[in-house]
């Protein structure tokens, strides 16, 4: 893997991303702080419907600033529908963001409240575009489900992911990751917020319709600590842990956040 020209700290940290990626100062950047008093209920927002085939889970990869679980996305075996969308969006991958301690780590915040971590389940508009990379640059290209994670009880649905981390300890490591349904990690309550935003790390494309569930899921402190035990460095390099990988909330710049609930 090429060396990253951006990071989460120091001279290539988030406050400097705009030097390499001017869109970092754009009008539709993510994450944001959701101010619940300013949110508008939108009766046209339908319930979110996900249908994921566990057989499409493929591999888990350490990408240096994070890890992700990738899915086979050649056809519509795993899709997201409903919500603000007319068509279906194909599942591509999921990943998490976290902080140095359990009292912060989520990227989105709610009335300033931070959660311990945040899950992002990434989908692309396969009805309109022919690949993830093409869709990622288009305003209507991506749909990302965000789920807040609160430190508390251990989450059995998360354990398979946690157990796989030891096999991808260092940057560039991959391991097979089969038979997993990420809908296990979606909260029971269907209440969500939605707005138009961006990827939360470079290239920061403003191509994302966000679906942010109101209800958090839980993970234990032990489970969350395993995220921080991953290394951003390759085997043989001086070890450096991925202690945090979250961007701070960005200005709303006139955007309207909508709620599926009153």
UniProtKB/Swiss-Prot annotation:
Annotated ranges, domain Alpha-carbonic anhydrase: 4-261
Stored InterPro entries: CA_dom (IPR001148), CA_dom_sf (IPR036398), Carbonic_anhydrase_a-class (IPR023561), Carbonic_anhydrase_a-class_CS (IPR018338)
Cofactor: Zn(2+)
Active site: 65 (proton donor/acceptor)
Activity regulation summary: Inhibited by acetazolamide.
Coiled-coil zones: none
EC number per UniProt: 4.2.1.1, 4.2.1.69
Modified residues (N-acetylalanine): 2
Enzyme class: lyase
Residues engaged in binding substrate: 200-201
Family assignment from sequence similarity: Belongs to the alpha-carbonic anhydrase family.
Stated role: Catalyzes the reversible hydration of carbon dioxide. Can hydrate cyanamide to urea.
Entry protein name: Carbonic anhydrase 1
Source organism per UniProt: Monodelphis domestica (Gray short-tailed opossum)
């Amino acid at each position: 893997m090429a060396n990253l020209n951006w990071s989460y700290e120091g001279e290539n940290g988030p406050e400097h991303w705009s030097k390499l990626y001017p869109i970092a100062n754009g009008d539709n950047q993510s994450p944001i702080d959701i101010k619940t008093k300013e949110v508008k209920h939108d009766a046209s927002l339908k319930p979110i419907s996900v249908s994921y085939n566990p057989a499409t889970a493929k591999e888990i990869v350490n990408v240096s600033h994070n890890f992700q679980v990738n899915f086979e996305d050649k056809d519509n075996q795993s899709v997201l529908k409903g919500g603000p969308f007319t068509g279906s969006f194909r599942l591509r991958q999921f990943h998490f963001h976290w902080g140095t301690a359990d009292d912060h780590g989520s990227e989105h915040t709610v009335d300033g409240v931070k959660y311990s971590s945040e899950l992002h389940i990434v989908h692309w508009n396969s009805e309109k575009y022919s690949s993830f990379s093409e869709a990622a640059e288009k305003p209507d290209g991506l749909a990302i489900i965000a789920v807040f994670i609160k430190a508390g009880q251990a989450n059995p649905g998360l354990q398979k992911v946690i157990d796989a981390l030891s096999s991808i300890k260092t940057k560039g490591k991959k391991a097979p990751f089969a038979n997993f349904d990420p809908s296990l990690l979606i909260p029971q309550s269907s209440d969500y917020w939605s707005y138009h935003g961006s990827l939360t790390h470079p290239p920061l494309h403003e191509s994302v319709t966000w679906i942010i569930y109101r209800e958090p899921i839980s993970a234990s402190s032990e489970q969350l600590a395993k995220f921080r035990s991953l290394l951003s460095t390759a085997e043989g390099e001086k070890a450096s842990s991925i202690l945090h990988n979250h961007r701070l909330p960005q200005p709303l710049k006139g955007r309207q956040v909508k709620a599926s609930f009153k």
